[in-house]
A protein has these predicted regions:
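Short loop/turn segments that connect beta-strands within beta-propeller blades
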Residues: 56-59, 184-188, 312-316, 375-379, ...
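Enriched but not universal
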Residues: 1-20, 30, 36, 472-477
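Autoprocessing Asn-cyclization modules and mimics
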Residues: 22, 66-71, 82-156, 161, ...
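Residue-level signal for WD-repeat beta-propeller blades
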Residues: 10, 37-38, 45-46, 55, ...
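Conserved short beta-strand element of beta-propeller blades
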Residues: 19-46, 51, 64-85, 163-173, ...
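Predominantly a core beta-strand signature of beta-propeller blades
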Residues: 15-18, 60-63, 189-192, 317-320, ...
Length: 477
């Protein structure tokens, strides 16, 4: 029977519900990083040796292998989920099959669990461009993935990427080998990544931000179309009238037609033309494309400084960005960061002057009401944007989650909730939790979960409380 949601503001009051508590209480630095895949698992990192996965379908927690993070766990630790997995391989954006058939892909990965229901994207080789649901897979060394039967057999020239969760975690304290690691869901492994290029010490508060192309059970396109022509380093759609440079640092993927499967970072854009690194196969007028967030980039901000860092997953390397305008002031305790890409206002969705996908919004925290945003395409900060009323301040203990047009905020450890309307630049009270929580601690343990049944979508906001094992959720009405 289809789900219907008859809840209405004023008529129906929002209610906080208690859900399964975690087995260990939150401490300074503890955080939850949300996977945006269809199962919506939540990674809870509580110390250098403790990590748990929350499954909202079952309302249950399970302990994971130790993160074995270097450093001293405290305020400043951060994590984020990416959309695409390369297993235990680092400095790569894809994997290569060892063989296969029309319905199987032989891998060199040791897959530890069933990936049925997740997806696999064929980047090049036979059947290039298709994104297929995983029917089943073998467990263990050199796992074999089964998909629906395709026109051609997969071979050792098949290049692919797994659409399964992978979490990137940055520890706190003095950085050393093991401070920056990834947890790969498919292989159930932690792998050390490079931290060269980051500050020597991580503290205060900080956030990792991803800009993935995949959301829930499909690609989240900012724009799409069919090319009218291309060169070795460009893709042209002469029917477009884009604002110059609006797509810089986004990503273009050839969905079908000539060059299908290829993915490139956009380095320049004009009214009709995207510039990219050299194509392996030059697209043409048959090439259907999508422009999305960039799967290769992670951003790190915080640490009591205005400096903004960017990590390349394919390069396993950090760089320090030099924005045209620097952030006006450093973020502090209780800061936030959210990549905004789902605003429904037409000003934001206009493809010729797109705003969705361009901005990372960040409340500064540190007993401040200020909010700034980083423009990804323009590589610049816009500081202290005007909104009303800008009277509530946020600091240690504040928790945030972004969904659609709004950023949801729990202030400090007061149980008071607010909802920041992004396109309207307005702050509203949301309600107050009638519960008791412990002392305020740095670390974001708030997230959102979607329930979907056909066209019906119901969103819940969850929060694991300050210095507590207790977790609650509330339906968005």
């Amino acid at each position: 029977m289809p789900t219907t949601n008859g809840n209405r503001p004023i008529l129906d009051l929002k209610r906080w519900e208690q859900v399964t508590p975690s087995s260990v209480a939150t401490i300074a630095g503890a955080f939850i990083a949300s996977s945006r895949h269809f199962r919506q698992q939540q990674l809870y990192v509580r110390s250098t040796t403790e990590a748990f996965l929350y499954n909202p379908n079952e309302d249950g927690w399970v302990q994971l292998p130790s993160p074995a993070l270097a450093g001293t766990f405290a305020a400043g630790a951060a994590g984020v989920s990416g959309a695409w997995s390369t297993g235990t391989t680092v400095a790569a954006s894809t994997l290569t099959a060892t063989g296969g058939s029309t319905s199987t892909i032989n891998t060199n990965q040791t897959i530890a669990r069933s990936l049925a229901g997740y997806s696999i994207h064929i980047v090049s080789g036979p059947n290039a461009g298709v994104t297929l649901s995983i029917v089943s897979n073998t467990i263990g060394t050199n796992s074999v993935i089964t998909v629906a039967t395709q026109a051609s057999a997969f071979t050792s020239s098949t290049v692919y990427r797994l659409c399964t969760p992978v979490w990137y975690v940055l520890g706190s304290g003095t950085l050393a080998s093991g401070s920056f690691r990834k947890y790969d869901f498919a292989t159930n492994t932690w792998t050390t990544l490079v931290n060269t290029g980051l500050p020597a010490t991580i503290a205060t508060d900080g956030k990792l931000i991803a800009t993935p192309s995949w959301y829930d059970d499909g690609y989240e396109a900012l724009a799409s179309g069919t090319a009218t022509s291309a060169t070795g380093t460009t893709l042209v759609n002469s029917a477009k009238n884009w604002t110059a440079s609006q797509w810089v640092n986004s990503q273009v993927r050839i969905v079908s037609g000539t060059g299908a499967g290829q993915i490139r970072t956009i380095t320049a854009s004009t009214a009709t033309t995207l510039t990219v690194a050299t194509w392996t196969i030059t697209p043409d007028a048959t090439s259907v494309y999508q422009i999305t967030g960039n799967d290769d980039f992670l951003y790190y901000m915080g640490n009591g400084a205005v400096t903004l860092f960017r990590y390349s997953i394919s390069g396993n390397s950090w760089s320090t960005l030099t924005p045209v305008a620097a952030r006006a002031a450093a973020p502090s305790t209780g800061m936030s960061a959210a990549w905004v890409r789902q605003v429904t206002d037409t000003t934001w969705t206009d493809e010729n002057a797109i705003i969705n996908g361009r901005r990372i919004y960040s409340f500064r925290g540190g007993v401040s009401a200020a909010i700034d945003y980083y423009d990804i395409a323009a590589n610049t900060w816009v500081s202290a944007i005007t909104y009303a009323p800008a009277t509530e301040t946020f600091t240690t203990g504040s928790k945030y989650t972004y969904y659609g047009n709004f950023i949801y905020i729990q202030k400090d450890a007061t149980n008071r909730w607010f909802r920041f309307n992004i396109p309207a630049a307005a702050m509203d009270g949301w309600n107050t939790m009638p519960v008791v929580q412990g002392a305020a601690v740095v670390g974001d343990t708030c997230f959102d979960i979607e329930y979907k049944d056909g066209a019906t979508e119901i969103v819940y906001i969850y929060m694991l409380m300050n210095t507590s094992t207790q977790m609650y959720r509330q339906m968005v009405i």
